[in-house]
Amino acid sequence: MEKPKIIALYGSPRRKGNTAALLKKAVEGARDTGAAVEEIVLRDLKLSPCLEIYGCLKAGDCAIKDDFQKVRDKILDAQGLMLASPVFFYTVSSHTKILMDRFQSLWVKKYWVDKTPLEKQNNTRKGLFISVGATKGKKLFDGLLLT
């Protein structure tokens, strides 16, 4: 039986912060159960923010050529996704937000172009989101839940 593939995305700008430490523990746990986990540090990638040039309207693919396509393909090929981001101003880090915004192209593909971005996927994917914040506000994580 093939090991399930999981992508672990480190969305913090700090390599050895609390967010990274928690995701590292989750990665260890997944590997202990037999999963093949690939770790990707978003701060190491060349990711442009969405430029709203509407190239995705043509075929559902983002027109900006950078590391997004490689990460997108790995995520689409995986059975699971782990994402970790610290709280920055009541939302995710800029590294994480850029990646999330770029996935708008899949929404366009699904709802505007051909409505089948995940047609080859017949399984249920699993996801885990880890976030850490330093302030004590009662609504500290509300923005992340909405995002």
Task: Give each language-model segment a name.
Residues K110-T147:
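Short, glycine-/small-residue-rich phosphate/pyrophosphate-handling segment
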Residues M1-V108:
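N-terminal beta1-alpha1-beta2 submodule of the flavodoxin-like/Rossmannoid cofactor-binding fold
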